[in-house]
Amino acid sequence: HIALPDFSSGAMENWGPMTYRETAMLANAKSSLSSKRQIALVIAHETAHQWFGNLVTMRWWDDLWLNESFATMMEYLAADSFYPDWNIWEEFAVNEAILSLRRDAIDGVQSVHIPVHHPDEIGTIFDGAIVYAKGARLMNMLRNYVGEEAFKSGLANYFEKFAYQNTVGDDLWRALSAASGKDVASFMESWLKQPGYPVVEADYDNGKLKLSQSQFFIGEGKNKKRVWPILLNANNPNIPKILDEKSIMVEL
């Protein structure tokens, strides 16, 4: 890790010596806790790229999320393991998330996975609110969906199999599916390839619960046909684990 006094980027995950702007890496006894937290997150993010991006690299830029979404999630995992008293996951729930939710609720926003047809388009896809912030929270949702042990095992197998190679998202899905026994590709497809996010409405009447999903949207242009597989947590066995239809009716 090398701190540079004059560096245009905040940090860069070079394959070997990672470089940082001094303010993104250096702290002292007088530094505020918020500065130390930010430095820890940046260092963890760039270190995560040694696996997500360097050891295994996406085949083409439409899978940029393989690098950035995972590295953004891993920065919080790493910081929490070193400094559990920081309660960094509380920050994960709000830091950048509000920006992402606002950005993702308007027309014209890109999806996490977006086709790139020409090198001139590459610079336009580095959307911090979507590929980084939203993508990281989707990866954390996936971690909860497959389970911690299956997630770790699947990643270990993925890195071992594809070390020093290029991959696509489906390669990772197959590794996580093999480790968890779940169809990860089907679960993640609409989350990655559709812009926006859903809101769930619950209506209860005479012992019946109706759950309906629709896209949360601000303004005109709402797509009423979009559906996401939404994880549900409930103490009633009649309520399914996943809502993957526009609406369902449940007897309680």
Task: Give the residues covered by each predicted segment.
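Hydrophobic alpha-helical and helix-loop surface patches within well-folded domains
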Residues: 1-221
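Long, His/Glu/Asp-enriched segments that create or flank divalent metal/ion-associated functional microenvironments
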Residues: 199-252
